[in-house]
Each structure stands twice: as structure tokens, then as C-alpha cells.
Amino acid sequence: EIGSGLVGSEMCIRDSLELFISLAKSAKQEGVMAIEKRANEIEDPFTRSTLAMVADGFSADFIYEVAESDIKQMEERHRAGALIFSQCGMYAPTLGVLGAVIGLIAALGNLSDIDKLGHSIAAAFVATLLGIFTGYVCWHPFANKLKRISAEEVEIKKMILEGALALQGNASSIAIEAKLQAFIPVSERKSMRD
């Protein structure tokens, strides 16, 4: 559904563009009630509430303030979630080194037993390797992916807000398409017209 998922944001952008072009045409022919009717059919809460404000006749300033506040709150939640994984990535190598120190202390306690000495040194190296591996191969990439997904979702919501404000200002479908094309990479704009 439009703007409902984090995966496949291009499809959400395409759907959003098509939605607002369609809404502008419907509003021109049927009036504001067409926007309200379509808003009730949309599953995405942000899109639905923003369009409901347009249909209810709220001012552009009010719609902008409410939607922008919603976007900022979402960004903060996403930032806090990504921060947890970033911190895990920072601490994992340190914990690996701590495991190495503990393994070496155990090795020093077993200097007389060669078999135990080898196992303790191996455990020390494994702890270091796991700490570095999880930090740089798991936690940091996951945090970066969350940040990228969040940025894409913010762009989609900003596009939806711009489309809603254009509808509120009675912009034509051509004007809305031109305005919302700014959210689409230039290389993909031609394919959007096909």
C-alpha cells in the first residue's frame, strides 16, 4: 500500500505520485469529498490523516505543522533505534578484547599444562575475533541500514506532505506531478511517465 512499507520505497514513491495526480483530478471533478472518500480507503496512517486534514479544510500551515511534527517524531524514534545498534557496534570490539584478556589470564594460570594453555590462548583469539566481527560485520552495518531506511521513509512522508499541501492549494494534477517529481531521481523520472 502507499507509504505503508519500508521495503520497496520506490514503489511507494510511484504509488504516492499516482495517488496525488489521481486525487487532484478527482477533486477537480467531484470536489473535496473525493479526497475524503479516497483518504478513508488508504491504509497508511500518515497519508490517511494528512489527506483527512485536507478534506476537512484545515489551513496549509496547520497541516504542515502537524505532519512535520509527525515526521520529526518518527525520525527521533528511528534515530534512537539505530543508535542502539551503533553502540553495540562500538562496544563489541571492546568486549572482544576483554574476552581476550580473560583468556590470556586463564592461559597464564595454566602455564604448566600445555593442553590447557593452548585452549586458553585459542579462546582469547576467538573472543577478539567475535568482538571485531560482530561489531564491524553485524552491528554497524545493521545500524547504517536502519538509518538509510529511515531516510527513505522520511523522503516518502515529505513527498506525501507536499502532495497534500498542493491538493489543499487546489493545484492541478500537472502542477502536482511537476512538484512531486523533485522527490524522484532524474534517471527514473522518464520511466515514471511510461
Please provide the spans of the model-predicted regions.
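Channel- or pocket-lining gating/hinge segments that regulate access to a cavity or pore
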Residues: K116-R189
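Helix-termination/interfacial motifs at the ends of transmembrane alpha-helices
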Residues: D70-I149
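Single conserved hydrophobic/aromatic residue that forms the stacking wall/gate
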Residues: E1-G8, C12-I13
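Solvent-exposed, amphipathic alpha-helical segments
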Residues: S16-S26, S49, M53, G103, ...
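Structured inter-helical modules in multipass membrane proteins
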Residues: F20-L98
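C-terminal membrane-proximal segments flanking the terminal transmembrane helix
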Residues: M192-D194
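A ubiquitous short alpha-helical element
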Residues: S9-E10, V32-K37, N144-S150
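Acidic, Ser/Thr-rich low-complexity segments on the non-lumenal side of membrane proteins
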Residues: I13-P45, L165-K190
